[in-house]
Amino acid sequence: MKKIIYLAVLLLIQTTFNNAVMAQENNPVLVPLPSVDDFTEGEDGWALGLGIGIEYESAYEGSDEFGFEAQPAGAVQWRSGDNIYYFAGEAIGWRGLLNDNWLVGALIGFEEGREESDSDDGRLDGLGNQEEGFELVLQARRSFTPDWRYWLVSRVVASDEGNLALFGVGRRFGEQTDGTGSEVNLVFVVHDSDYANKGFGINAIQSLSSGLEETKLSGGLRSFGIDYNYRENLNSDWQIYGEALFEYFSSEVRDSPIARSNFEAEVGIGVIYKF
């Protein structure tokens, strides 16, 4: 039932914004940002990019253990004017331009759970496994310049296990306007108590089973972060990309026994073939 509700919300949002979209010149990409996949080359209709990436990342939120993981890359996309509908891995969504300065979008994504076995050192023993689920993500960027050199970014994540919001500023580097080059975003993240305790809380039963102190977090500041994205066309078909993320947790999160590290980090690189 929740999947149906999320899909209905997604379609309603798209329909509402679609009426407000302004006609624009035919550009190779919707916006010239390396973090935004666009394989349509400015043409309406279907587009496909498939590839693979390798990530070196924290084993779980707050972990001091790291490991490599292979991830699929790319997406199936369908473009209609200033709107792109897409299916990418574990997410289905839409993004569109309201005008020259506003990029908005919505998606339904798959949220991975957490298992005790995620920690090779047994740091999660006794905490139990968390089920996988779905989340609704609403996103918006507001550019300060016509060429998307500087912008504000916001994102809201809603699920039945809590809510999270991100706000920040970004900058694009390089003179390209085809979606290649690099960009950086500086952000801060807030969460409600449900979302905070999902990742870092310990209830009475978990405390008895794990030996860790019972912990209950309140809502508020979660972290400060910086992320970097890079994209380059090797030729007309092949594309490489890279990304890096660093997130420094707030004092309340750092005080949780689950947070074995004060930060979360991730580095990834991959290759995509555009059909």
Predicted regions and their residues:
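Strand-connecting loop/turn motifs
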Residues: E43-A47, G81, N99-N101, S143-R149, ...
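Cleavable N-terminal export/targeting peptides
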Residues: M1-D44, S63
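Predominantly the C-terminal beta-signal and adjacent terminal strand-loop region
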Residues: E61, N229-F275
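Outer-membrane beta-barrel "beta-signal"
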Residues: Q71-V76, V169, F188, N262-F275
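Transmembrane beta-strand segments of Gram-negative outer membrane beta-barrel proteins
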Residues: T40-Y56, D100-F110
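Outer-membrane pore/translocation modules
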Residues: E25-N27, I84-N185, V190-S218, E252-V253, ...
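Transmembrane beta-barrel domains of outer membrane proteins
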Residues: G53-E55, A75-Q77, R95, V137-S143, ...
